[in-house]
A protein has these predicted regions:
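Small/polar/charged residue-enriched interaction surfaces, especially the RNA/DNA-contacting tracks
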Residues: 1-216
Length: 216
């Protein structure tokens, strides 16, 4: 089963790395890039936020073990661990015609709530079109993983959770999202359903083949 999320990263994303060059007009950090020089959202960042949200949903519906089956778990010995059935790769940010901005930031003392003197910094953030791609392996738990993932992606599409750091400063939120679910049938036919979020509030569902009913 494949699930895709297409949307606008309408506020700057927040996974940064230190710059290798210095200067007054050079930011202290910028978004992570891949070997091709493209800005990316690491798969580990996507997995991290989804793992946390799916864990909350699992607790809310009073179930256990669903997240472990999706993401896997470790053990003291290699034989005791188990890999999950949810695969998530890095996502390229298509920011060719979108925002590429340097922001001035300040450090806040978490104990006093005041500004730390001399800790002003500059970071380069980007925004643009994104397409998250998820593959769920058919191991007997694919439908349960898909259902839990769709609930978490719904929260992302509605602006309840963000990707990366910077939640408090409005970074990493997705808008105008379309969630696409593709399921392979027994005879090799692909069934498809679309969930469209307009302005993070108005929702349209296209599911003529009852794909959602099979996994929810």
């Amino acid at each position: 089963m494949s699930i895709y999320v297409i949307g606008d990263l309408h506020l700057p994303f927040g996974v940064n790395k230190p710059m290798d060059v210095f200067g007054e007009d050079v930011p202290n950090s910028e978004n992570i890039k891949n070997a091709n020089g493209e800005y990316i959202i690491p798969g580990s960042s996507i997995r991290g936020v989804l793992h946390a949200q799916m864990k909350k949903i699992e607790k809310y519906i009073n179930k256990s073990g669903l997240v472990d089956k999706a993401f896997g778990y470790g053990g003291e010995r290699a034989a005791e661990g188990k890999k999950g059935n949810l695969i998530c790769n890095d996502t390229v940010i298509d920011c060719e015609k979108q925002m590429d901005v340097i922001r001035n930031r300040i450090h806040i003392d978490k104990f006093t709530g005041g500004v730390i003197h001399g800790h002003k910094f500059r970071e380069k953030n980007v925004a643009g079109k994104v397409r998250f791609e998820f593959e769920i392996q058919d191991d007997g738990n694919a439908d349960k993983t898909a259902a839990l993932l769709l609930f978490a992606l719904r929260d992302m599409a509605m602006g309840i959770i963000n990707v990366g750091n910077g939640y408090a400063t409005g970074k990493g939120f997705i808008s105008n999202s379309t969630i696409i679910i593709e399921s392979m049938g027994k005879v090799g036919m692909i069934s498809k359903a679309d969930i469209i979020y307009k302005d993070n509030e108005n929702i349209e569902v296209s599911d003529n083949e009852n794909v959602l009913a099979k996994v929810m």
